[in-house]
């Protein structure tokens, strides 16, 4: 059958294209003669054309990858003249021969497994006699029972011999290991040769170049390398010195030739240092310490200066009298009788220098009056009534009298009243006490009423003066009644009918004293508001008494009770002036 494309040049001269593969000229001429004698086989039109084409593409790809020449043209020429007999081996299928011979796949050799899977169908090649027409297939199929796709390797003359050599396949790892060992040995040889060259180069340098080289290495080498080199050098020098010392004396060692690793310009200096180290011992260190201690003893000893007294703290000590001797919160006149600073005259001198010495005089007088109360009168009264009710009644009477005495303590405790009380009872005071400012003794007993009014007056008027007196113990009933009724003194003051006490009964009598008003810190201390001294000390008193509640709060007086107390004091000063 004449088809287009078969008259083109041979397959070897053309590139591979996606078209039905051409066949060679000899095969094509053979097929033309065969087709002229016999017509196309039955069922040729129903044959699947793509099977042979796919096999050809796979074969060409495999040939290009392996770079092998699988075409045996010599055998093909011999087999063209001598056609194959019709009888083939049992492993070759019937349907393989006509289709492969027609499409130029006669040189393909296949085994029984592949031909049974693809080409044994009778529909693909129904014409059996055409199997004997292709002469080239016989030479490839003479290998009976061979299941390989390719022909035997011995039949390919152009195949390189190294392909068949598998002797070194399992020895590659050993060869690689031997190669690595040779390279390492060569590198080690090169390393030691480089070290020898480097040492020889160092020996040729002069001392100045040696110093330059050492400086460069110290500045550029890593720290760990320098430390390792230092330790090795120390151990080497120590070993060299010990070995030399055992063999010969030190003066002979200096005349020896320079050994390897020790620089000759510095050998003398090194030997001197080692000699000095040998001469050092424990006795030398002890003697040096003893000499240092003698030098220290000969030097003048340094004396620590004594701390200076704080003159600022001592200045104005009348405002800080509370810091010298602590004052209790209850302001009880009996607390400080066992104080260690009981008879110190220094406090008396400081009080005489104070601008408010008249307040101290009045307060101390009240303290002495409260301390010199006459307990026998209370005991007589208790023996007459034989009950504690009389003591309670006398305590209430004392509170009322004390409320009257707070108006003016000097008038309530004048000398006429004290002499009258002394003549009425006919008793003399067993103890005598000196006043701190006057230096005179006072005698005479006092009633419980006068004692309590002095105690209440003292608690209301004096806030910063320590108590320096002693007194006899009072009966327990009187003490209990005092504790239970001491807080009611101001209420009694408010209910008293004195013409001078309206809204300022809780204020001290000297609240409007001009001397105190000119000294705001002392005036605030009298009111027990000295904690606000820093807020109000810079204000003139005539301006201060005009302040209201809001102004005081702005100045820093945050407590409501303190503001109310200041406002009452301002009203008292305004009324008195």
Swiss-Prot record:
Keyword flag Transmembrane helix: no
Top-level taxonomic group: Eukaryota
BP-aspect Gene Ontology terms: nuclear-transcribed mRNA poly(A) tail shortening; protein transport
Gene symbol of the encoding locus: VTS1
InterPro entries recorded: SAM, SAM/pointed_sf, SMAUG/VTS1_RNA-bind, VTS1_SAM
Stored CDD domains: SAM_VTS1_fungal
Domain spans labelled SAM: 515-576
Biased composition (Low complexity): 495-506
Family in the record: Belongs to the VTS1 family.
Quaternary state and interactors: Monomer. Binds to RNA.
Main location: cytoplasm
SMART domains: SAM
Comp. bias (Polar residues): 26-38, 286-298, 340-355
Record function comment: RNA-binding protein involved in post-transcriptional regulation through transcript degradation.
Species this protein is from: Debaryomyces hansenii (strain ATCC 36239 / CBS 767 / BCRC 21394 / JCM 1990 / NBRC 0083 / IGC 2968)
GO cellular component, one term: cytosol
Molecular function terms, GO-annotated: mRNA binding; nucleotide binding
Signal peptide range: none
Region called Disordered, residue ranges: 1-41, 286-355, 415-510
Biased composition regions of type Basic residues, renumbered to the chain: 418-430
Official protein name in the record: RNA-binding protein VTS1
Subcellular location(s) per record: Cytoplasm, Cytosol; Cytoplasm, P-body
UniProtKB keywords: Cytoplasm, Nucleotide-binding, Protein transport, RNA-binding, Transport
Upper classification of the organism: Eukaryota, Fungi, Dikarya, Ascomycota, Saccharomycotina
């Amino acid at each position: 059958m004449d088809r287009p494309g078969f008259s083109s040049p041979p397959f070897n001269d053309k590139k591979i294209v996606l078209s039905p593969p051409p066949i060679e000229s000899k095969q094509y001429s053979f097929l033309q003669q065969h087709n002229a004698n016999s017509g196309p086989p039955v069922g040729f039109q129903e044959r699947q054309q793509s099977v042979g084409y796919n096999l050809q593409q796979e074969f060409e790809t495999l040939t290009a990858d392996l770079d092998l020449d699988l075409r045996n043209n010599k055998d093909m020429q011999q087999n063209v003249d001598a056609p194959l007999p019709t009888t083939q081996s049992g492993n070759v299928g019937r349907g393989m021969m006509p289709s492969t011979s027609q499409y130029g796949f006669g040189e393909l050799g296949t085994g029984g497994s592949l031909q049974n899977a693809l080409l044994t169908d009778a529909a693909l090649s129904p014409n059996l006699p055409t199997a004997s027409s292709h002469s080239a297939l016989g030479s490839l199929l003479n290998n009976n029972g061979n299941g390989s796709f390719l022909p035997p390797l011995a039949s390919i003359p152009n195949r390189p011999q190294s392909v068949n050599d598998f002797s070194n396949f399992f020895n590659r790892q050993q060869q690689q290991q031997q190669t690595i060992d040779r390279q390492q040995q060569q590198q080690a040889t090169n390393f030691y040769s480089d070290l020898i060259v480097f040492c020889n180069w160092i020996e040729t340098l002069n001392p100045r170049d040696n110093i330059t080289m050492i400086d460069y290495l110290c500045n550029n080498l890593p720290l760990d390398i320098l430390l390792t080199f230092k330790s090795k050098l120390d151990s080497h020098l120590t070993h060299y010195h010990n070995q030399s010392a055992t063999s010969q004396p030190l003066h002979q060692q200096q005349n020896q030739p320079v050994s390897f690793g020790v620089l000759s310009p510095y050998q003398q200096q090194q030997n001197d240092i080692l000699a000095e180290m040998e001469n050092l011992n424990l006795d030398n260190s002890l003697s040096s310490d003893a000499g240092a201690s003698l030098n220290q003893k000969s030097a003048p000893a340094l004396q620590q200066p004594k701390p200076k007294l704080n003159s600022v703290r001592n200045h104005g000590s009348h405002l800080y009298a509370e810091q010298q001797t602590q004052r209790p919160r209850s302001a009880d006149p009996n607390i400080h009788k066992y104080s260690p600073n009981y008879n110190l005259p220094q406090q008396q001198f400081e009080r005489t220098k104070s601008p408010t010495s008249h307040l101290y005089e009045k307060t101390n007088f009240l303290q002495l009056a409260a301390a010199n109360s006459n307990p026998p009168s209370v005991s007589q009264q208790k023996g007459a009534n034989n009950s504690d009710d009389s003591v309670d009644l006398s305590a209430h009477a004392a509170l009322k009298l004390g409320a009257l005495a707070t108006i003016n303590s000097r008038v309530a405790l004048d000398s006429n009243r004290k002499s009258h009380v002394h003549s009425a009872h006919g008793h003399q005071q067993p103890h005598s006490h000196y006043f701190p400012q006057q230096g005179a003794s006072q005698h005479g007993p006092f009633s419980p009423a006068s004692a309590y009014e002095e105690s209440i007056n003292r608690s209301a008027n004096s806030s910063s003066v320590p108590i320096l007196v002693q007194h006899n113990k009072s009966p327990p009933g009187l003490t209990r009644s005092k504790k239970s009724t001491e807080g009611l003194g101001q209420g009694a003051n408010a209910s008293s009918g004195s013409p001078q006490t309206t809204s300022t009964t809780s204020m001290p009598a000297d609240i409007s004293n001009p001397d105190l008003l000119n000294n705001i810190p002392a005036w605030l201390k009298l009111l027990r508001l000295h904690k606000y001294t820093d807020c109000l000390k810079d204000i003139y008193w005539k301006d201060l008494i005009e302040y209201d509640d809001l102004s005081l709060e702005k100045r820093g007086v945050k407590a409501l009770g303190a503001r109310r107390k200041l406002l009452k004091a301002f009203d008292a000063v305004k009324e008195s002036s």
